[in-house]
């Protein structure tokens, strides 16, 4: 990423996204932070989402870190619910559809759990990897972001 770029960070308020956004800003990039904590207009499960469309369309690069997740206790309690699966499926369909439409380079944040087919979270992350590969994006897999 040489020179100043317009970068969108999907999931910019999360454990990784907050630090990544800060780092990219310090490096002189124009960072558009996109996260549901910024308001309902940044809820990526809403289709269509004009704010998300504009964020992706106006970017040179996108970091796709957003996911409906919240640590091991959250996963244990919610990953087998309709809402969890529905939210993440919609979120991915929305973002990947726009990344394809505007042909934007991107990185998708996956997980070491993506090979765990018994876990809805793992299965959804694997689906994200397949979307990413089909669109020519890059996949990064995190093991444990909490230390």
Which residues does each predicted region cover?
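N-terminal Rossmann NAD(P)H-binding glycine-rich loop of SDR-like oxidoreductase domains
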Residues: 5-27
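Structural motif
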Residues: 6, 60-61, 105
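Rossmann-fold NAD(P)-dependent oxidoreductase module
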Residues: 19-23, 98, 131
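Adenosine-cofactor binding site in Rossmann-like domains, unifying the SAM/SAH pocket
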Residues: 31-52
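NAD(P)H-binding glycine-rich loop region in Rossmannoid oxidoreductase-like domains
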Residues: 49-87
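Conserved Rossmann-fold NAD(P)-dependent oxidoreductase catalytic core, especially the SDR/UDP-sugar
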Residues: 64, 90-123, 138
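Active-site segment of SDR-like NAD(P)-dependent oxidoreductases
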Residues: 69-70, 111-119, 143-146
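Conserved beta-loop-beta element that borders a ligand/cofactor-binding pocket
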Residues: 106, 110-111, 130-147
């Amino acid at each position: 990423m040489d020179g100043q770029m317009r970068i969108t960070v999907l999931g910019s308020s999360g454990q990784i996204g907050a630090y990544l956004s800060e780092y990219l800003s310090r490096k002189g990039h124009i960072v558009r932070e996109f996260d549901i904590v910024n308001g309902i207009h940044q809820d990526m499960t809403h289709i269509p989402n004009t704010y998300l469309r504009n964020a992706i369309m106006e970017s040179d690069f996108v970091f796709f870190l957003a996911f409906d997740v919240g640590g091991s206790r959250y996963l244990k309690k919610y990953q087998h619910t309709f809402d969890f699966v529905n939210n993440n499926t919609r979120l991915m369909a929305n973002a990947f559809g726009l990344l394809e439409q505007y042909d934007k380079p991107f990185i998708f944040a996956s997980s070491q759990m993506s090979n765990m087919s018994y876990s809805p979270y793992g299965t959804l992350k694997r689906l994200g990897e397949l979307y990413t590969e089909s669109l020519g994006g890059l996949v990064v897999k995190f093991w444990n972001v909490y230390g």
